[in-house]
Amino acid sequence: MADTWEAAHSAIKTGIIAYPTEAVFGLGCDPRNEVAVQKLLSLKQRPAEKGLILIAADYSQLLPYVEDSAIAQDKRFSVLSHWPGPVTLILPVRKGVSTLLTGGRDTIAVRVTAHEPARALCRELGHALVSTSANLTGQEPARTAAEVRQQFGDSVDWIMDESTGGAANPTRIINPLNNQVFRDDA
């Protein structure tokens, strides 16, 4: 596994990686590297105004992006009770976070994943990852490493060859502060 992690560390410095999530493969990069984020948006043919999701091994990895102090004490349990799990939350964004991640909004989409391969990857790298489905905009998302290779070829710098979590649909996306549902898991 040490060779695998070494390859992941090398690829994430400036490149795009692919890894399994709860339902599909995700394409990701280091959210702190704007060049890599732009490269990812271009590869996916995804408009920047849509924003991106960040996944993490634990909530502390999301604190550089989430304005934690803007989450009212009475809502904190609701926020944290969703994780780890297959629920992406829309939370207040910290000042200075790239608009490439937020789509220009004052919120950011984040998830503490319970899917162990993705969680282990975030733990090993020591930070959150951008997570967007591994597909060109308008096409079906890849569910295997082979499908990622088929859609993207050499454009992806490293692929974690593990299984997805087996969920039929992508994660639910909600704002727990106002109970707005952006994407249901049904």
Curated annotation (Swiss-Prot):
Its EC number is 2.7.7.87. It is found in: Cytoplasm. One of its GO terms (cellular component) is cytoplasm. It catalyses: L-threonine + hydrogencarbonate + ATP = L-threonylcarbamoyladenylate + diphosphate + H2O. InterPro entries: DHBP_synth_RibB-like_a/b_dom, Sua5-like_dom, TC-AMP_synthase, TC-AMP_synthase_SUA5. GO terms for biological process: regulation of translational fidelity; tRNA threonylcarbamoyladenosine modification. Residues 1-186 form the YrdC-like domain. PROSITE patterns: YRDC. Signal peptide: none annotated. GO terms for molecular function: ATP binding; double-stranded RNA binding; L-threonylcarbamoyladenylate synthase; tRNA binding. Keywords: ATP-binding, Cytoplasm, Nucleotide-binding, Nucleotidyltransferase, Transferase, tRNA processing. Its main location: cytoplasm. Gene3D superfamilies: DHBP synthase. Belongs to the SUA5 family. TsaC subfamily. HAMAP family: TsaC. Required for the formation of a threonylcarbamoyl group on adenosine at position 37 (t(6)A37) in tRNAs that read codons beginning with adenine. Catalyzes the conversion of L-threonine, HCO(3)(-)/CO(2) and ATP to give threonylcarbamoyl-AMP (TC-AMP) as the acyladenylate intermediate, with the release of diphosphate. This is Threonylcarbamoyl-AMP synthase. It comes from Idiomarina loihiensis (strain ATCC BAA-735 / DSM 15497 / L2-TR). The gene is tsaC.
